[in-house]
Design a protein with these regions (language model features):
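Domain-length accessory/inserted modules outside core catalytic folds
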Residues: 2-131
């Protein structure tokens, strides 16, 4: 039985952001991200007091239509495209870790409804996401 992993899902296609607990298995990531190829990147989230998190993302998000930005930096530049799942940093064995309740609140405070030229009504997007 796989361990459970608590993270924040930013689903740009269904236009929602929410905490979600999943099994820490590859198929679970494919299912919640609605994709067939993932990548895991480390990004700092926040303004002055940035904190590092791992972000599981759709590695082929740019090839999907419509292309929807899921994360931007402090200047509004796109960082990630497609659905994303944000977790804690990896442990000493390289395994993803769950978010704390504080981390969930912190991340959700950085998710805002943002508009783009193609999507003028806006949808949830992670802001203040940087290298």
């Amino acid at each position: 039985m796989a361990k459970k992993l608590l993270g924040v899902l930013v689903d740009v296609y269904n236009e929602k952001a929410q905490p979600l607990e999943i099994e820490d298995e590859l198929d679970s990531f494919y299912k919640i991200l609605d994709c067939t190829c993932i990548d895991i990147v480390r990004r700092r989230i926040g303004g002055r007091f940035k904190k590092a998190f791992e972000i599981v993302c759709d590695d082929e998000g740019l090839f999907r239509e419509p292309q929807k930005i899921s994360a931007i930096d402090n200047l509004g530049q796109p960082q990630l495209v497609g659905n994303i799942f944000i977790t804690g940093t990896v442990d000493v064995d390289g395994n993803l870790t769950s978010l704390t309740k504080y981390d969930v609140s912190y991340i959700l405070s950085k998710v805002q409804k943002m508009s783009t030229r193609k999507f003028i009504n806006g949808y949830p997007m992670l802001t203040q996401c940087e290298y």
